């Protein structure tokens, strides 16, 4: 793991001791989550902007932003302590490419148009698509980090679902919604 990702993991574990931002108690529990956040870089198309919905403790957005410093990331996180954590990360790590917005997706009003919309453990895929597609460019993609429950949430083609261990990555183009 690169040193910046190690710094992120260390800071998250420190904050977890008092703020319970994630279930991870040690680095060996957090490393697979960071690897999981980065895995889609192996198969998704290049992107220049990303909206992460329900950023929480920063997964997947922070590892992605650290690996792709040329990409603009907008992190939507309504909860105060999680937004404070994300702002702290921005102040101590080289994360000039992120903007943190303390709002729920349903309350976020913006002319924003991004190439990629990500989300991990937030809501059903159909809800996320319905509420966020207005922020996605016509040639953009949704990337949702899901589990086996994906098949109960939404119909998806084999070309839209990628598996790695217990994770299902749902990767769907906006164009295919029509």
UniProtKB/Swiss-Prot annotation:
Protein name (Swiss-Prot/TrEMBL): Ribosomal RNA small subunit methyltransferase G
The coiled-coil regions, if any, are: none
Gene3D superfamilies recorded: Vaccinia Virus protein VP39
- Record keyword Ubl conjugation present: no
Gene Ontology cellular component annotations, sorted alphabetically: cytosol
This molecule's function is given as: Specifically methylates the N7 position of guanine in position 527 of 16S rRNA.
Q: Which GO terms describe its molecular function?
A: rRNA (guanine-N7-)-methyltransferase activity
The UniProt catalytic activity note for this protein reads: guanosine(527) in 16S rRNA + S-adenosyl-L-methionine = N(7)-methylguanosine(527) in 16S rRNA + S-adenosyl-L-homocysteine
Where does the record place it? Cytoplasm
Q: Family per UniProt?
A: Belongs to the methyltransferase superfamily. RNA methyltransferase RsmG family.
Q: Which InterPro entries match?
A: rRNA_ssu_MeTfrase_G, SAM-dependent_MTases_sf
Q: Which organism is it from?
A: Helicobacter pylori (strain HPAG1)
Q: Which UniProt keywords apply?
A: Cytoplasm, Methyltransferase, rRNA processing, S-adenosyl-L-methionine, Transferase
The UniProt record lists the EC number as 2.1.1.170
PANTHER family in the cross-refs: S-ADENOSYL-L-METHIONINE-DEPENDENT METHYLTRANSFERASES SUPERFAMILY PROTEIN
Q: Which residues bind S-adenosyl-L-methionine?
A: 54, 59, 105-106, 120
């Amino acid at each position: 793991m690169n040193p910046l990702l190690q710094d992120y993991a260390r800071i998250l574990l420190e904050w977890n001791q008092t703020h319970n931002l994630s279930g991870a108690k040690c680095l060996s529990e957090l490393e697979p989550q960071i690897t999981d956040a980065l895995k889609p870089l192996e198969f998704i198309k290049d992107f220049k902007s990303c909206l992460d919905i329900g950023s929480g403790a920063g997964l997947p957005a922070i590892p992605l932003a650290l690996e792709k410093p040329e990409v603009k990331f907008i992190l939507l996180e309504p909860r105060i302590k999680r937004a404070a954590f994300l702002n702290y990360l921005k102040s101590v790590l080289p994360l000039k490419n992120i903007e943190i917005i303390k709002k729920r997706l349903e309350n976020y009003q913006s002319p924003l148009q991004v190439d990629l919309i990500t989300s991990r453990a937030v809501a059903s895929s159909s809800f996320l698509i319905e509420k966020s597609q207005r922020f996605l460019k016509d040639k953009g993609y949704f990337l949702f980090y899901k589990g086996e429950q994906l098949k109960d949430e939404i119909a998806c083609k084999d070309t839209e679902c990628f598996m790695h261990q217990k994770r299902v990555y749902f990767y769907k183009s906006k164009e295919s919604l029509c």
